[in-house]
């Protein structure tokens, strides 16, 4: 969002104005076109119908590529390049821009917002990631009643980022406290394929899969809250691509397909896999007429995730498992829902002070602030503690049916391994030493 007004000479519109798809005077018309292919790949990861047949491995064995939730509807929102992320989020979440003010229209246009993009470079933000303007807005969009008394909240899922493997490498929007951040694990589908032939980086046999990828960004968030939340495939797999794709596009090093599919990956793939899983979950909840909010979706996905036996700041709750999440909703045995009563309040307390400096009037938001209600969250954030202070919480475990389940609780201790000091001078807004 620009800090000054600019008026287009041709159409007479101020920058940041939402325009109709077609100008009645014939000066312009809008075209939704994914010229790079990234949006097509992320959408196909979620919604591919799996009807096209491909010879992926050049062995005459035909394959289809099915999305996670093939019956969903995709609402494309142009937000980067010729667009604005903030405007796109607000509109998809059910707000309309009227005379430079955002007015809630009564319900979100999308059940889930999926973000396969991110900014991990501090200087380009001019704010600490997690306390930046976009993170404040994302947090408010997730929480019911934050922007309007009737606002129901929107589930927002984002890539954790590809800046790993160090801790504290997440950027916005994945680092926002109340959104769902998704990191990347390996797949064995691409082993020996095309440009990956002979590469040992992710394992050269099909025995290797579901390992956390080196580039997957790690937590924690800037206030110390646990991130990421979930993991899914990000290195790598196949997706349908645009029908305008030329032979060899998006592939190098030999073995490039002549058909309209591509190798895709990164946490840009992980996020839509989780978003598709959330869509299946929403479908199940609606079929059973069960009430839910973004925190219920988050807790169901995290409670049903498969533990990959990494620390929480690397893997979150673990590998997303849509089937087990739906099984909890349907009351099947073997899985349970877990959440605590302190995380939401502790996060809110930590971000309330920087949030108070945010001038929402500049963005046309009259009712800005985080709801005073509390919401259960699976992961635990103990708050900001001074030396010698303690914190506690109460975890609630919900069995989805009447059959007994066995639960094992294993305490773990985190300890300092080594203390290092780095000397250097940081140039503000430019680079770190």
Question: Can you say where each PLM-predicted feature lies in the sequence?
Answer:
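Subtilisin-like serine protease catalytic core
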Residues: 1-87, 105-111, 122-124, 150-153, ...
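Extracellular S/T/G-rich loop segment that most often corresponds to the catalytic His/Ser-adjacent loop
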Residues: 2-19, 23, 174-275, 279
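Surface-exposed intrinsically disordered loops and tails
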Residues: 2-32, 55-62, 94-109, 143, ...
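Substrate-binding/access-modulating region of protease and related hydrolase catalytic domains
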Residues: 34, 76-193, 222-225, 246-272
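Hydrolase catalytic cores
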Residues: 43-45, 75-79, 169, 232-313
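Structured segments of extracytoplasmic/periplasmic soluble domains
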Residues: 45-52, 88-98, 116, 140-144, ...
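Secreted peptidase-domain scaffold signal
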Residues: 161, 322-433
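Flexible glycine/proline-rich, aromatic-decorated loop/lid segments
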Residues: 198-203, 231-255, 298, 302, ...
């Amino acid at each position: 969002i620009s800090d000054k007004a600019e008026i287009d000479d041709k159409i007479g519109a101020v920058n940041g104005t939402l325009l109709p798809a077609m100008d009645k005077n014939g000066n312009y018309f809008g075209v939704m076109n994914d010229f790079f292919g990234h949006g097509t790949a992320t959408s196909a990861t979620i919604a591919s119908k799996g009807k096209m047949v491909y010879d992926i491995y050049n062995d005459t064995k035909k394959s289809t590529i099915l999305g996670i939730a093939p019956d969903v509807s995709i609402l494309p929102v142009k937000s980067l390049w010729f667009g604005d992320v903030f405007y796109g989020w607000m509109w998809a979440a059910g707000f309309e821009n009227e005379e430079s003010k955002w007015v809630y229209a009564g319900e979100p246009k999308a059940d889930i917002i999926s973000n396969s993009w991110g900014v991990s470079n501090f200087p380009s933000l001019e704010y600490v990631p997690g306390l930046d303007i976009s993170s404040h807005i994302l947090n408010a969009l997730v929480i019911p009643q934050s922007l309007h008394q009737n606002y129901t909240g929107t589930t927002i899922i984002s890539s954790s980022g590809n800046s790993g493997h160090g801790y504290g490498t997440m950027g916005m929007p994945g680092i926002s406290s109340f959104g769902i951040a998704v990191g990347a694990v390996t797949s064995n589908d691409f082993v020996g394929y095309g440009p990956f032939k002979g590469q040992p980086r992710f394992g050269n046999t099909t025995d290797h899969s579901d390992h956390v990828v080196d580039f997957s960004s790690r937590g924690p968030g800037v206030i110390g809250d646990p991130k990421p939340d979930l993991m899914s495939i990000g290195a790598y797999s196949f997706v349908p691509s645009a029908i305008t794709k030329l032979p060899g596009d998006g592939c190098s090093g030999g073995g490039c397909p002549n058909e309209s599919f591509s190798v895709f990956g990164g946490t840009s793939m992980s996020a839509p896999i989780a978003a598709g899983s959330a869509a299946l979950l929403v479908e199940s909840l609606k079929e059973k007429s069960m009430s839910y909010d973004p925190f219920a979706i988050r807790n169901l996905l995290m409670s049903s995730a498969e533990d990959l036996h990494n620390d929480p700041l690397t893997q979150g709750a673990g590998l997303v498992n849509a089937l087990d999440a739906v099984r909890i909703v349907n009351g099947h045995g073997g899985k349970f829902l877990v959440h605590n009563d302190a995380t939401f309040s502790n996060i809110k307390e930590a971000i309330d002070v920087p949030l108070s400096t945010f001038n929402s009037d500049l963005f046309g938001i009259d009712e800005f602030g985080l709801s005073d209600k509390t919401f259960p969250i699976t992961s635990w954030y103990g708050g900001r503690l001074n030396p010698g202070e303690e914190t506690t919480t109460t975890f609630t475990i919900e069995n989805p049916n009447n059959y007994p389940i066995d639960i094992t609780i294993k305490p773990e201790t985190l300890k300092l391994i080594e203390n290092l000091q780095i000397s250097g001078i940081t140039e503000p807004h430019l680079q770190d030493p």
